[in-house]
Amino acid sequence: MDLGSMLYNSFNNITWSTTTLPLDRLISSYRLPQIVKLDSGESVEGLRENDYLLIHSCRQWTTITAHSLEEGHYVIGPKIEIPVHYEGQFKLLEQDRDIKEPVQYYNSVEEVAKAFPERVYVMEEISFNFKMASGESNEDTEVYNITLSTGDELTLMGQAELLYAKSSREKSRFNTIFKRIGKLNSISKLGRGKMPCLICMNHRTNESISLPFQCRGRFSTCSQLELQMQEGEHTIRTIVEKTRLPVNVMVPSSPPRNPHDLHLIREGHRYKLVNIQTKTVVVCCALRSNKILPVHFPLHVSTALPRLLVPEGLLQGESWFETVVHRWFTYCQEQFDIDDYSRAVRDVRVDWIEDGKSPKKSSAGGTGSGSAICNSSGSGSNGCPSHLHLPSSLSSARDELTQSFHRLSVCVYGNNLHGNSEVNLQGCVSLCGDCAPAEPPDADYLFPELQENSSGSLKSDVPYEELWLDHVKNAGPVLDHNEGVRGNSLSSGCTTALPYPKAGPTSALLSADVNLPPPPVPPKSEAVKEECRLLDAPPIPPRSSKQAGSSSATVPYPSAKPRQKDTRSPSPTLSYYSSGLHSIGGEGESQIESDDQNHACYPCSWIRPDASESSKPLPCLNPSVNASFSRLSWPNDFCGADSYKGEDFQSLHCRSYSSYPRKRTPGTPKACPSGLLDFDKRANFEGKAVSSKVQQVTQSAQFCTKSTSYNMDMCRDKPTDECITKQSQSCPILPPRTPKCTDAKKDAEAATTDTADADAVELESKSCSPDGPHPGTTDVFSVSHPVATGLSWQPPSNLSGISIEEISKSLRFIGLSEDVVSLFVQEKIDGNLLLQLTEEILSEDFKLSKLQVKKLMQFINGWRPKM
């Protein structure tokens, strides 16, 4: 008697329990290999009822789906799957895409943007750097470096305009003047420009990048590797790693034979490699008296896996049963090579593309079946109703090719192309998304811990990490609960699916599965991280913000937030990935103001949360407060409601991001309802008596939603340098706006009228300052108007020592427009600077017309208009 017959006779000594488990539950509960028996009534192709099965191992197979071709690139025959470690050689043919779209070459990013192909490849090393501006009104800059390596694959996503800081050569005329008088920092506004960029995804780094049109380098629509692959013969693994699928190949020579091949690849055959699939299979051996029949079961199929009888020796943890299993396993190892079995070429017998409706099945579901595809319902002539989906004609097969196949990117798989690697699924099948099978109709045994909470407690928008941790928390008590129910299930004859059975000494149920680490999250670029965070939380200012002396602390990320819906870029060519170029602080760099600030209205540090103070009449409030809020391009969802909580915000700094496109949520108020203006974080104006009319005007000015002139009257009692520092820390300077009235009388009437038109509100300095302006101090930021001082004002004959305020009066006096006055105020042009300006600077840098330049130059040279 041979060894196989002796081992087969040992089955007579095995007592079989009434416990039946589906295959996926079995492999997740017990250490492999194990011996089980096919349950009565189970219909599995290639197996007989009550066959003994040795569950050999779980393996991960990576295969390439291919179609047979005839001359002229027509698809014929069934689909096949070729393992990635197939030992045969292939030669690349002329590709369909190269015939339709010949290979193109480009010498700059601008040329790529004009043609805008789907993807390009970098043909040489490219390095480029430029200074990025943090915002239009922020003087901070940061150098942005771009490095591209040869062979990088870039998928084009869109275009955007980004703020950049101009180089010193572009403003050298200003530098010469400003260095001479020591005011080089006053030209920051003119050092900003908009740079068109091409938004791309670099597949090597898996990050989005913005390439300026100025960047030069060689690009191509075909990679160098793919061009080099046109010559010679290559393995299928080399082809899928270095070319884009689909690709046409030919078999140049007779390939090696595999005894387990179900499809014979012959010399001269042509194939179209269409996509790549990775799936997890359970390799088993049907144990018979005269032979061993290898079979495998894919875990990612829509049909139910077979139910198997479990022996009593496994449930009781008997050592003699473990010895029997070990002997059978050794015998099977001698009879067949599982690696050869895993490398076999097989026909795709089930149309997984149509069947894979869910993302889980379509992305990782695999395309292969094997010699054992089961269906417990037994419908169909062969027990596999899915086989009816086979393409029946050339047209249907050709239609399949028109579907959008997922192309293989080298950065996704890299060196992780599994050929037949063994994987351990103990305790992971019900947790890992890679291993969990799709739910069949009778899947009452799947995810028992979730069946109890079927009321929808598991939300689809729960973050990935929290979702995993939630599973881990629930795993322990669920297993304990199921152990207690096992006795009742056994006595009932096991008509329903059983929970995990109790593990004996040899069954080795993995109790450590509760502590399994979550599967790795795909890497995200910093731009994507910032964009995802900014959609759900208030933005964080640049790390280079000039906050001095404010207490800061790191803020943990909120656990859950309502998702902002339908947040899209207003421009179809503008991508959110362009936000990655801004100097955003990373995790741990976000700052929050001290507790004495009002969290109901971020971003400025002027407002106090004290309800008693906020309920008082506000003695002086400048309309520019709310104007600065309206200037911000951040979403206004977080400004204007007292019900918002402090923990909903991560940062309260005031910065302007003009290149962050956001859509306002409907119903969001634009106004900032309450708060005290207080630069020194103390109540400077408590106890000050103000008139009720000024209070009314101030309260109406609170809800100003348009830009008004920036006025620092409330800062007049402080030195000028301190005012400059405070202003630069708070909000960007807004251009001045003149009232619609033309005399002081109308201005006073407008100030005392309770009107809702906030654009016309200008508070006089005497009603805003509690102590009045100190003599000798000059407010270089407040831009007053001729009406404020009467019509008798005349510009001085000597302009060298006058202030910015007087320059503004002078410009209005000679009849220049408010746009010109605003530009001079923004650039802080005083008398000394005005005398240094030339016609070239006024026309080219200030963009003045010839008439304006002539009038201003005559004014500088001493001309005064007659009254």
Curated annotation (Swiss-Prot):
| Pfam families named among the record's database cross-references | CABIT (PF12736)
Enumerate the residue ranges of region (Disordered): 511-530, 536-594, 735-758
Give positions of region: CABIT.
12-322
Name the GO terms of the biological process aspect.
Answer: cellular response to epidermal growth factor stimulus; epidermal growth factor receptor signaling pathway; positive regulation of cell division; positive regulation of cell population proliferation; positive regulation of ERK1 and ERK2 cascade
CDD domains from the xrefs?
Answer: SAM_GAREM
- Biased segments, Polar residues type: 544-554, 569-581
Q: Which GO terms describe its molecular function?
A: proline-rich region binding
Source organism superkingdom: Eukaryota
Q: Which residues carry this modification: Phosphotyrosine?
A: 464
Q: What does this protein do?
A: Adapter protein that may provide a link between cell surface epidermal growth factor receptor and the MAPK/ERK signaling pathway. May promote cell proliferation.
**Protein name in the entry:** GRB2-associated and regulator of MAPK protein 1
Q: What is the lineage of its organism?
A: Eukaryota, Metazoa, Chordata, Craniata, Vertebrata
